[in-house]
Curated annotation (Swiss-Prot):
Positions in the Cytoplasmic compartment: 603-712
Residues covered by the Sema domain: 28-494
Signal peptide: 1-16
Compartment(s): Membrane
Record field: transmembrane: 582-602
GO biological process terms, semicolon-separated: axon guidance; negative chemotaxis; nematode male tail mating organ morphogenesis; positive regulation of cell migration; semaphorin-plexin signaling pathway
Full protein name: Semaphorin-1A
PANTHER family in the cross-refs: SEMAPHORIN (PTHR11036), SEMAPHORIN-1A (PTHR11036:SF127)
One GO cellular component, as annotated: plasma membrane
Domain of life: Eukaryota
Disulfide bonding pattern of the chain: C99-C109, C127-C136, C262-C375, C286-C333, C497-C514, C506-C523
Described function: May function in growth cone guidance.
Lineage: Eukaryota, Metazoa, Ecdysozoa, Nematoda, Chromadorea
GO MF annotation, one: semaphorin receptor binding
Amino acid sequence: MRRILTLLLLFNVVRSSEAITGGVVNLRPKQIINSVGIGDRFGGIGTSSDESDHFKLLAADGDSLLVGARNAVYNLSLSTLSVNHKIDWKPPAEHIEECIMKGKSKTDCQNYIRVLARKSAGVSLVCGTHAFSPKCREYTVTEFGIRNTRQFDGQGISPYDPKHNSSALYVPGTNQLFVATVTDFVGNDALIYRKTIDETPSSKSAANIRTQSYDARVLNAPNFVATFAYKEHVYFWFREIASEAIDNNEEPQIYARVARVCKNDKGGARPANERWTSYLKARLNCSLPSGSSPFYFNELKAVSDPIDAGNNNHVVYTVFSTPDSDVRMSAVCKFSMKKIREEFDNGTFKHQNNAQSMWMAFNRNEVPKPRPGSCSPDSTKLPENTVSFILHHPLLHRPIPSVAAPLLVEGADRADLTQITVLPRVRAVGGHNYDILFIGTSDGKVLKVVEVDGNATVIQSATVFQRGVPIVNLLTTKESVVIVSADEIASLPVHNCAQQTSCSKCVQLQDPHCAWDSSIARCVHGGSWTGDQFIQNMVFGQSEQCPEGIIVREVFDDNESEAQPEAVSRSGYPKEHSTITVVLVAAVASLISLIIGAFIGIRVNRWAATSEPHRSASSTSGSDYDSFGRARLTRHDSLTTATKVDHGFVPQSKQSVDATSLVMSINATHHPMSMSQHGSGINTPSRDKNAIVTSINQNTLPRDYKVKKVYL
């Protein structure tokens, strides 16, 4: 039943994507790059091949890249990925033994560094899992090297499990750390937490504030994806089980969320003095619209930093996917921070009267004032009804829609999209600026995508790691993109213009980094693009200025190494894989496999039911006779009875037809033919042809001739 429902959803995708995206899905890259083993690489130090470093990109500071790893923090050169400094921090042996006794593996019972913050010049905060007993340290750079100056409990700051999805943000100047993680050994108590880090152990701590424990209305088994500060708020992006939604099978649904808190939130009056008074969350809507039944991408996987979009607005690029199923899809959606702020500031709240009632919009006239969730100069003085309301109604009623339809949709025959980073406002020939997206996949590739007038073009697909190694972090600089897997880090250039050797192919890339220099006849990378010798067309990917003129464009299959000619439509654009083609092929394949599986199961059950009571040595595998000596009907045998065989030398008489039919194959010349020639699985005894015919004409068979009976 679940598979049939999945197929029905696929047809909904077809209808939605045909109407919204013009039938384009699985956009083919303009060029393919195999970068496995190429470029600067870092693979850890002192880690065996069967151990994982669980690399996590923590920060970029000038020319330094700070990476958390297994029992270590690496300070890498951003330009070469060589090691500038390394801090070793391994748990004591007794902590590892205690962790193992609690049921964890020796691999997990190490110290995986998950949080790092630069507090001030020369002082860094480092936190790790520390054998499922999180700890934090402050390291200070002195003239004698890097020294550990302080260690304290990291509960609520670092996760326990290195595989747990968590995020953290240090706000300079406030000495506060905003964290989204779990605070117990088994990972059930999820929280969004603000921790004030003391400069000295004796200094007075400000209020540490967190979300309520074990309250599904606030957080329900979340997977945290990203955290960043924007104006007076801190935003948390995650996915969780939606308390307000249950599907037709009464199974939990995963929804994508964005939540926010005020930076200056001091908590409420007692007993809510350690609870947020500004915590709100809303659902994110990344979907293919189709009337009353959109196709949703519900699972948030990655979020970019806010990108300046002009007009006092920023946008955020995100990666979504559908839940695990036979047909899994991914999408890239863009959200406006201005729209998000408007919904948080003015949106309707959602509420449920009791556990059995439906979730509904809360009556605006009954919302207390000041508005719950708004920032207050001193939240401890807020009215009790305002604080109580926000503790019980943190969810907004309306989902926050993406900016238009998804920019990019990857179908079931593609790898999942896992990470995203953006190189903003790249200048093209002519002075226009474009955002370039670098998107990681679950099979070790990085897609380079440009957005032109709201449409996505996949410029390049680069294979960075061996197939099956997911991309877990991405970082861009002006000239390079840093790609992180669990056990390897690579740095590659942001462009590969020199791969194209003709004007038409260079222009076809639609890459703002690349243009054809007619003065030297090369595809070059530039920044200022001064001069009129540069040929580029970001909108159509074709130019009459090229010596070749406008040619039939070539697109690349990302599974092949060579270009394949692609037909050009009347508009001049190449035809991509149609959504109807990709999705229907997947749907038909799934349906056929379902039917074949059911058919085989029925046949096996029938065979087992009939053969079990009569099992004997004679009923061996491969025999064409059952345990009673009766011939089995094979799939190669004809069911045509003797009365329907039209040949001249067999007399038709009632006596020659009874419940037992002789099955014989007659060729075009009306000569009896050995059944073995039809691949029946047995070899008919060699007989004289004339003797057989004579016997048949006399309505008899030779005594040693075997007859195959068919019971109808």
